[in-house]
Curated annotation (Swiss-Prot):
This is Holliday junction branch migration complex subunit RuvA. The gene is ruvA. Keywords: Cytoplasm, DNA damage, DNA recombination, DNA repair, DNA-binding. HAMAP family: DNA_HJ_migration_RuvA. SUPFAM superfamilies: DNA helicase RuvA subunit, C-terminal domain (SSF46929), Nucleic acid-binding proteins (SSF50249), RuvA domain 2-like (SSF47781). The lineage of its organism: Bacteria, Pseudomonadati, Campylobacterota, Epsilonproteobacteria, Campylobacterales. GO terms for biological process: DNA recombination; DNA repair. Residues 139-185 are annotated as: Domain III. Its main location: cytoplasm. It comes from Sulfurovum sp. (strain NBC37-1).
Length: 185
């Protein structure tokens, strides 16, 4: 599973980039917010990989909160990567959390591909979606990356935070420590 990529931007469009990673050029789907945030030729993106029968798709994000938002909406029945990316292009994670908290169906219906029925389902299923302030602070650091890696392995966020409390070190050290502690929980 690919969780991150670093390389040189060969081509940039509003909804995708071509990223040269050691001579191999990948097409990575991005939100408009991520596309606008790319200012340098060399970038590091957090990746969600979606493997289907007919395609192997990469979705890239500059911000871990945006990646978390994308991954969360993908878990909702009837919401695919296209709609997930449209949500990420329409809202920042903070704005999306406010829309969900206020149960604002009309705001959610502004997203291309979301009608009243889908908007209601999203609001019901994401009632507890919050942008974690602590995760936002450490999202670019080792702790945020370790939490993201452990979540991608299927562990619950509460258990991960419990396991990583009091731990320090680089990302790989934190992931190893987290796995050891999570096996005991």
């Amino acid at each position: 599973m690919i969780v991150g990529m670093e390389g040189i931007v060969e081509r940039r469009d509003p909804t995708f980039i071509h990223l040269n990673v050691n001579g191999i050029i990948y097409e990575i789907q991005v939100s408009i917010n991520t596309s606008n945030a790319i200012q340098e030729k060399r970038v590091k993106l957090f990746i969600t990989q979606v493997i289907r029968e007919d395609a192997d798709l990469l979705f890239g994000f500059m911000d871990t909160n945006e990646k978390k938002m994308f991954d969360t909406v993908l878990k909702i029945n009837g919401v695919g990567p296209k709609v997930g990316l449209a949500i990420c292009s329409t809202f920042t994670p903070e704005t999306f959390a406010k829309v969900v908290a206020s149960k604002d169906v009309s705001m959610l219906k502004r997203v291309p591909g979301i009608g009243p029925k889908a908007a209601s389902r999203i609001l019901v299923e994401l009632a507890d979606f919050i942008v974690d302030g602590n995760a936002a602070e450490g999202s670019s650091g080792a702790l945020g990356e370790a939490v993201m890696a452990l979540e991608s392995l299927g562990f619950k966020k509460d258990a991960i935070q419990k396991a990583l409390s009091g731990c320090s070190g680089d990302t790989s050290t934190l992931v190893k420590e987290g796995l050891k502690k999570l096996q005991r929980l």
